[in-house]
A protein has these predicted regions:
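Extended hydrophobic/aromatic segments used for targeting, binding, or gating
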Residues: 17, 246-248, 254-268
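A short beta-strand-loop-beta hairpin characteristic of the jelly-roll/cupin
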Residues: 1-17, 27
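Double-stranded beta-helix
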Residues: 30-71
Length: 291
């Protein structure tokens, strides 16, 4: 689960699965679950015969609320460089990429509250399958179905929204996808093909025809929103920094600023932990140095 650790007089630290907290002797502290999560941990004590925990006063509701709120609102101001809708896209995309359905569920409700329609949110979840696979995309959609059903049962309005517009371009899907990729990346269509495209031409055709034509041409999301979603999904998947380099470069080419990408990573850090955000901060730093 997700929890908090706080030493007396210090800010609360948000902790995630896999985190290790080392506590020196005689440090007054508390730890426990985040407001929206369960939390379990293993404690390893050195010198157990002489080293014992001393239980002090309980943490009051006011102390707990103040500590967790300060941590959760750490990036609230800086993240305003992204619109509420964009912040919602980042949250649901990163949770989907990781496969964290427990926290995806409230994030989906927040996306509806941010003004997104059912069809627009579905589009983010559909887009996700190209980067994290059908299983996580479909499980995210099933989770969204639960959210919509529960809101309906509580009398809450869920606007469905419009459908994607029909494609009127008469060019082949490959040509359309090729042109979309050139537009969003700034790489000319006659540039030398990447090594993978030469080695496995079929995947290059699928990328052009399906990803950049069938998906990117659907106008329920802008190119900008799709790339914010893509980077967020890749952050949730983890370990795919070479892919993130390409898509973060596309973000910058589309006019998304380094500050806005940093805000995206702030959201990933708060929701998933630094294990997921820090590798991409390194990518962003390298890209901005090269500009």
């Amino acid at each position: 689960g997700i929890g908090y650790y706080q030493e007396k007089g210090q800010p609360a630290r948000r902790v995630y699965p896999g985190d290790i907290v080392e506590i020196a002797p005689d440090i007054v502290h508390w730890h426990g679950a985040a407001p929206d999560s369960w939390f379990a941990h293993i404690a390893i004590t050195t010198n157990p015969k002489t080293n014992a925990a001393v239980w002090l006063d309980p943490v009051s509701d006011e102390q707990y609320s103040k500590a967790t709120s300060a941590s959760e609102n750490r990036y609230a101001e800086t993240n305003k460089v992204l619109a509420d809708r964009e912040q919602a896209i980042v949250a649901i995309a990163s949770y989907t990429g990781k496969g964290d359905l427990e926290h995806l569920k409230p994030a989906l409700a927040e996306a509806l509250e941010a003004g997104m329609t059912i069809n627009e949110i579905n589009e983010v979840l559909i887009h996700a399958y190209a980067y994290c696979g059908f299983p996580r995309s479909l499980r995210a959609i099933q989770t969204f179905m639960q959210v919509v059903d529960e809101r309906k049962a509580n009398g809450m309005n869920n606007p469905v929204g419009r459908k994607a517009s029909a494609i009127k371009d008469s060019n082949s899907r490959y040509e359309r996808g090729r042109d979309v990729l050139a537009e969003i990346s700034g790489v000319p269509i006659d540039a030398p093909k990447a090594g993978y495209a030469v080695f496995a031409p079929t995947i290059e055709r699928f990328l052009k025809e399906h990803l950049f034509a069938d998906l990117f041409e659907r106008d329920l999301l802008t190119y900008r929103e799709r790339e914010l979603a893509t980077v967020s999904i890749l952050a949730g998947v983890g370990g795919v920094e070479p892919m993130a380099v390409g898509h973060m470069s596309i973000c910058l080419h589309l006019g998304i600023t380094a500050e806005q990408i940093s805000a995206l990573l702030n959201i990933v850090e708060m929701n998933l932990g630094k294990t997921y955000s820090e590798p991409l901060r390194g990518v962003l730093n390298q890209l901005t140095k090269e500009q």
